[in-house]
């Protein structure tokens, strides 16, 4: 498998990216919203296999204090190949020099991210657009 990596936004098919998140499965993400999010991200990577988008990730970063890795996804056909690990490693490498690198991930993947040195934070809090849904999905709790 020969993969092509890029951080360029110029040839991204935002509908294809939306379909990747749906298939991963990481939910429904609007193509226009994805374009805004990735365009606003300091670091990003898109991975192609034979012109098909198979993996993606991004990080919001300020260049000094904090880099925030999020929206990492791999197409099911390429899950288990080490691609997700490579995407995270690439974003961590790009984020080097920041005082902290924060990661947002789906529940149940903590062991995977510990391999990169990530530790669970005890001080993080969030306000979601739909607090009840976030609670239902286990993303937040009352404590």
PLM regions: where:
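A conserved beta-strand-loop-helix scaffold within acyl/acetyltransferase catalytic domains
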Residues: 33-73
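Short amphipathic alpha-helix that is part of the acyltransferase structural core
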Residues: 1-32, 124, 137-143
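Conserved active-site alpha-helix within GNAT-family acetyltransferase domains
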Residues: 97-102, 106-130
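Short glycine/proline-centered loop/turn elements that form peptide/ligand docking sites
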Residues: 88, 131
């Amino acid at each position: 498998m020969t993969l092509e990596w890029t951080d360029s936004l110029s040839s991204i098919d935002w509908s294809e990216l939306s379909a990747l998140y749906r298939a991963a499965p990481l939910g429904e993400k609007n193509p226009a919203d994805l374009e805004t999010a990735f365009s606003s991200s300091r670091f990003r990577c898109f991975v192609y296999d034979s012109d098909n988008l198979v993996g993606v990730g991004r990080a919001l970063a300020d260049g000094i204090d904090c880099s925030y890795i999020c929206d990492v996804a791999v197409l099911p056909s390429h899950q288990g190949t080490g691609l997700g690990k490579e995407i995270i490693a690439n974003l961590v490498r790009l984020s080097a020099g920041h005082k902290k690198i924060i990661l947002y991930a789906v529940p149940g993947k903590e062991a995977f991210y510990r391999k990169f040195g990530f530790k669970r934070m005890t001080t993080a809090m969030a306000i979601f657009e739909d607090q009840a849904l976030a609670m239902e999905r286990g993303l937040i709790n009352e404590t």
